[in-house]
């Protein structure tokens, strides 16, 4: 098999999507157990409070991270592929030095801004001290992100999988007992313990491959300029993402209550996180390979289209199954107190189909280092997201939020694909459009039937649709892989 086939073949994409999808599935399964226990112990209000703290951590981490998580992977991946070992070690030392700088910056900024964050997040009580105590989490997150970028760029895929599994196991065994004993008072301490355990696990692996070295001199700043220039553009995109996340949760807390925040967070977790298991291989495997393609338009289009096909075919049966079983799955995953979010989740599942179309194409600008393009696309998405979120909530409560997510995905994909065609000569294959039409038809059928009937006939039709989606995906993927091996 030549290099082109290796990097863009269905077998390679399916292999690593399955590996990381399987690992992420295990991680999510353990996370489900943890979330179930936390939901029972804290309820929607406690889950809402935790969501606000987590969105604050993400916002400050993205603001002070300087986009190093993305620019470092791109830089190190190139050196690793070209086997420039000495330069690679030097760059790793540079990235670690800047991880320390961003960790300190995040710590200080969190402490300084805590009164302001408290003012805009809560209309009641004083949580300034709680926000200050998030500072160590932000510092540890920055240090962990630097080490993870090194492992991603140098293709330590198995180790990354192990880090994910051990991290979520530590979160389970440390946080649940604290919530059981102390209730909501344990939220911030448990978040600190989770961040610390994740950091220890990560450095245990990364230090094994590349011993820890840092330096702080004039070269630390001069050598990092190209990487920082690229990273700062990604920084803006990251701030918009975590900022919009923070805005919508704060908006829900002000306009509604912490219960609304908890319900929304549960719905978001089920759709965007649990159903996003298939996308876990994107950043770890797909992005480095796409970065190595360079300016070869034909190979890039082949790789992106195949990633689109595999992602859609793998995720569609899972989404249709989730849609059908939501009335049963939602109380099992959380509790009966979260059933009010069912209408939102059901319609928001269609946003995941949009997500499967969006991610592989969005990574083109990222892989090319077109920071301005990436920034503008991200800004467009989050402006659409906040607008549709506000309109949806004001007009149809939680169901409106779910519908807003779908409309956001649809409008953004139209913009994204038109731009990708104009800028990068990317064109989606007719075969991919056919697959999408079939899977969307089956999903629409299940949505309509499950929303309007609860008879034996309706359940039979839903089961038939799930089986049809699964068999169709299996047939296409099997034939695609067989065709590659026949051509060898």
Residue ranges and their predicted role:
Residues 1-13, 202-245, 285-302, 423-437, ...:
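Interhelical loop/hinge segments that connect adjacent transmembrane helices in multipass membrane
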Residues 2-5, 447-488:
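Membrane-proximal transmembrane or re-entrant/amphipathic helices at the cytosolic face
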Residues 66-82, 153, 210-211, 267, ...:
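Helix-loop junctions and terminal segments of transmembrane helices
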Residues 128, 132, 161-209, 226-230, ...:
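Hydrophobic alpha-helical transmembrane segments
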Residues 139-163, 185, 349-381, 420:
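Membrane-interface junctions at transmembrane-helix termini in multi-pass inner-membrane proteins
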């Amino acid at each position: 098999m030549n290099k082109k086939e290796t990097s863009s073949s269905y077998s390679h994409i399916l292999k690593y999507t399955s590996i990381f999808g399987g690992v992420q599935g295990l991680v999510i399964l353990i996370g489900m157990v943890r979330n179930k226990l936390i939901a029972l112990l804290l309820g929607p209000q406690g889950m809402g409070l935790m969501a606000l703290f987590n969105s604050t951590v993400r916002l400050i981490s993205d603001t002070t991270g300087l986009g190093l998580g993305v620019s470092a992977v791109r830089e190190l991946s190139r050196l690793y592929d070209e086997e420039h070992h000495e330069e690679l070690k030097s760059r790793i030392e540079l990235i670690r030095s800047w991880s320390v700088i961003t960790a300190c910056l995040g710590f200080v900024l969190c402490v300084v801004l805590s009164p302001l964050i408290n003012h805009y997040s809560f209309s009641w009580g004083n949580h300034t001290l709680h926000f200050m105590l998030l500072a160590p989490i932000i510092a540890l997150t920055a240090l962990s992100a630097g080490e993870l970028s090194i492992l991603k760029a140098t293709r330590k895929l198995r180790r990354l999988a192990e880090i994910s599994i051990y991290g979520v196991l530590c979160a389970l065994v440390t946080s649940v007992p604290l919530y059981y004993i102390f209730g909501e008072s344990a939220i911030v301490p448990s978040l600190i313990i989770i961040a610390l355990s994740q950091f220890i696990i990560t450095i245990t692996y990364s230090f094994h491959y590349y011993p820890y070295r840092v330096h702080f001199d004039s070269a630390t700043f001069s050598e990092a300029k190209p990487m920082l220039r690229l990273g700062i553009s990604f920084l803006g995109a990251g701030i918009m993402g975590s900022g919009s996340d923070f805005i919508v949760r704060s908006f829900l807390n002000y306009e509604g209550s912490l219960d609304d925040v908890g319900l929304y967070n549960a719905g978001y977790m089920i759709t965007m996180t649990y159903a996003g298991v298939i996308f876990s291989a994107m950043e770890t495997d797909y992005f480095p390979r796409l970065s190595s393609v360079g300016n070869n338009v034909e190979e890039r289009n082949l790789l992106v289209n195949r990633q689109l096909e595999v992602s859609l075919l793998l995720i569609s049966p899972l989404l249709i199954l989730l849609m059908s079983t939501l009335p049963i799955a939602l109380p099992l995953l959380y509790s009966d107190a979260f059933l009010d979010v069912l209408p939102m989740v059901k319609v928001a599942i269609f946003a995941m189909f949009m997500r499967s179309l969006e991610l592989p194409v969005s990574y083109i600008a990222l892989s090319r280092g077109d920071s301005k393009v990436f920034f503008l696309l991200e800004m467009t998405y989050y402006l659409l997201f906040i607008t549709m979120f506000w309109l949806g909530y004001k007009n149809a409560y939680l169901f409106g939020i779910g519908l807003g997510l779908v409309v956001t995905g649809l409008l953004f994909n139209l913009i994204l694909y038109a731009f990708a065609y104009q800028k990068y000569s990317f064109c989606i294959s007719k075969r991919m459009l056919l697959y999408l039409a079939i899977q969307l038809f089956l999903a629409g059928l299940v949505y309509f039937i499950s929303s309007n009937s609860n008879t034996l006939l309706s359940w039979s039709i839903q089961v038939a649709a799930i089986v049809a989606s699964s068999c169709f995906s299996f047939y296409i993927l099997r034939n695609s892989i067989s065709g590659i091996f026949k051509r060898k």
